[in-house]
């Protein structure tokens, strides 16, 4: 390999190494920032799973018994398996829009008030459920960023290894001299080319 080609390869490896290292750092930062934001936004809300089934904890959430909701995974479980279950029971299988329409259509003020109370509870519950699922969504994005950061770091290490190899080859002087000049009669000719 000629010296000029080796220098080009080394420069490209340095550029690739810098790009991959920056990408890895940015991905790790995105993971850390997102995870911290999720925790810092959920902590002040003081949302916690019930201690046990007697307090309303569904059986499939027993691993979270008594824990405060601080992670995206916990937020998703709380939103879907706890709030979702209770909203389904409160709304008797119907969504907020159904109960809101029932309240507006009711001619009896007592029935209208009862239906509106159900609609209000469903609205608040669905709003909280949506917010908790947003935290979970961002936690998934944070996990993807972590995986990308690791992949970029591994790729950067591979490029660094090849860069070290190229520099070592250059230092030991294993370049070839590029022959310049017309072809000699002993060199093979390509078929059809004179």
Where are these regions (language model features)?
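Hydrophobic membrane-insertion alpha-helices, especially the h-region
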Residues: 10-26
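C-terminal TM-helix exit segments that contain a strictly Trp-centered aromatic cap at the helix terminus
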Residues: 22-30, 160-166
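Long, solvent-exposed extracytoplasmic domains/loops
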Residues: 47-126
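Residues that form generic nucleotide/phosphate-binding pockets
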Residues: 41, 81, 85, 131, ...
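Alpha-helical transmembrane signal-anchor/signal-peptide segments
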Residues: 29-48
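Juxtamembrane interface at the cytosolic side of transmembrane helices
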Residues: 2-14, 140-194
């Amino acid at each position: 390999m000629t010296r000029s080609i080796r220098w080009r390869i080394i420069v490209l490896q340095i550029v690739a190494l810098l790009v991959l290292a920056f990408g890895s750092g940015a991905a790790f930062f995105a993971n850390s920032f997102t995870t911290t934001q999720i925790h810092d936004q959920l902590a002040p809300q003081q949302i916690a799973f019930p201690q046990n089934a007697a307090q309303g904890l569904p059986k499939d959430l027993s691993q979270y018994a008594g824990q405060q909701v601080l992670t995206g995974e916990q937020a998703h479980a709380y939103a879907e398996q706890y709030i979702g279950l209770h909203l389904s029971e409160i709304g008797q299988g119907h969504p907020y829009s159904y109960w809101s329409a029932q309240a507006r259509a009711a001619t009896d003020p007592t029935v209208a008030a009862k239906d509106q109370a159900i609609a209000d509870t469903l609205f608040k519950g669905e709003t909280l459920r949506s917010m908790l699922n947003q935290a979970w969504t961002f936690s998934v994005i944070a996990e993807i960023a972590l995986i990308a950061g690791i992949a970029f770091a591994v790729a950067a290490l591979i490029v660094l290894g090849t860069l070290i190899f190229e520099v070592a080859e250059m230092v030991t002087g294993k370049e070839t001299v590029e022959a310049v000049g017309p072809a000699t009669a002993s060199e093979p000719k390509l078929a059809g080319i004179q």
